Amino acid sequence: MYHLGVPTGAGDHMFVVRDEHHQTAIQKLKDSGFTQAPPDRRAAPEIMEFLPDPQAVFDEINKGYERLDRYCTSFQFPPRLPFSGDQIFLIPNSFAHLPLDNLGIPSNLSSQMAQPKQYEVYGNLFYPLEAALVESFVKGVVHDIEEVGYSSWQLLLNAWISMMRGYLEVNDDILDNCADERTAQYGGWDLRVSKRLGSGKEMPVDMRGNTIS
């Protein structure tokens, strides 16, 4: 989202690869000095030290990302790299659901065809544009609801969708051409700004600055 203009601030590094390349990518990261490690979602040490049972809290946090962790592989950056201390998630596309239309053609034509529609292409890196990224997030929500019912990962995906709606002015019709009916019907996002919708304390403008009638 950051490359599209959404001020994400901080977060983990996430790379999506085709399923058939997933194990090869894992090995290449290991060969480059990356250490396979479970996701580190602990709160700051000054918070953890005051918890009566920090491990129980940590386990409860991870429970909300159970489906993500089951499909993905996480690594620690090696100390020699600028992002030392950060983590990277390697995600198979069967989980991410990024559209792969026009990507199975020769590389000299791939960037020309994929860039205007779905991706910005830099060498062998494909940065998803708005439609591809929203489709990926929405499919993630739909599949998460089907498999686990409710999760922190689902809430995070919805938050990302909301940020794209606000900062990039992505509209409900961005999914109209999606072949997956459940994804195409997803929408009706609320643009009101409040921590508690329905409390009567919503701001008089939506997240785009438009007056709410």
Feature locations, PLM:
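Catalytic cores of NTP-dependent nucleotidyl/adenyl transfer enzymes across multiple folds
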Residues: 51, 56-213
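Generic structural motif recognizing short loop/turn segments at the entrances and edges of beta-strands
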Residues: 11-13, 32, 46, 71, ...
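Metal-dependent nucleotidyltransferase catalytic core
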Residues: 17-62
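Active-site nucleotide-donor binding segment shared across nucleotidyl transfer reactions
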Residues: 1-13, 17-26, 213
